[in-house]
Amino acid sequence: MKTIAITELTEIEAIIRKCPYCTVGITDLEGNPYVVPMNFAYRDGVIYLHSGPEGSKVTMAERHTRVCITFCEGHELVYMHRQVACSYSMKSRSVMCHGNVRFIEDMDEKRNVLDVIMQQYTSDEFKYSEPAVRNVKVWEVKIDKMTCRSFGLRPSEVTSE
């Protein structure tokens, strides 16, 4: 099975938009990896996340702002030879993004980002109460490194390397 790099930004963004959630990798307070699924929105090279105003992941991200965010879609079990276990693979496409977390504090900016996040999941319009906006932590991660791969391709599916 082959793995190929995907470099076309429009294709990478299409993969991101197909994902219902992302996984965020943070460094915990002891220096260990901590990975958590989160709802998100993506716009113009920026990933937006939201969470409660406090808790483990917020404390970690305040201490260690560097994060890795991954997206994966299109899971399909594939094989080259049905009776050969090592020929099996999971066909999928994944995007890996790196950046630093900035917590948005401005109330109007928070509302705008919450709209962007909600647009990821629904076309409905929303209003946000002052207490609700005050009680949410809005994360902004400007992507400074992004890679994308397609895994589990049969040689006949690879058009170029």
Show which residues each predicted segment covers:
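Extreme N-terminal tail/first-helix region
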Residues: 1-18, 159
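Charged, gly/pro-rich active-site loop segments
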Residues: 2-3, 76-161
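Short beta-strand segments
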Residues: 19-53, 69
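Short, structured patches in soluble enzyme cores that scaffold and shape functional sites
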Residues: 26-28, 71-73, 143-145
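Beta-strand-connecting loop/turn residues
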Residues: 45-46, 65, 144-146
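Helix-adjacent hinge/juxtasegments
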Residues: 57-81, 86-88
